Amino acid sequence: ELTATLNAAMKMGFNKVWAIFQPHTFSRTAMLLDDFAEALKIPDQAIISAILPVRETNTYNIYSTDLGAKVPGSVCLDTFEEITDYVCKNAKEGDLILTMGGGNVYMCANMIYKQLKYMEENK
């Protein structure tokens, strides 16, 4: 799903495609680390949030930075606030910003929208 979505997005003619990805569970991230890394090399910019643990503890000793290390140019940020600030400072008109993952990463979309709207209204 990740690969198919990102490949399709890259063909849509946007200036730049951003993928904000929230890994879901430590076990799944450990098992699919290389697959996630290959998919996250597709967009122009990948932002990786902290792993959403759900009910797990990190017995796998895996972190978002492990995934980020496999994706050249990616940025690992722990909080949605940090992600929002980074995107709002760096994204440009004509860019596509996707939120992807099995958790609450969708909340970033609304946060980014609100911050960009505020920035536009207070130029």
PLM features: what roles do these ranges have?
Residues 1-123:
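ATP-dependent carboxylate-amine ligase
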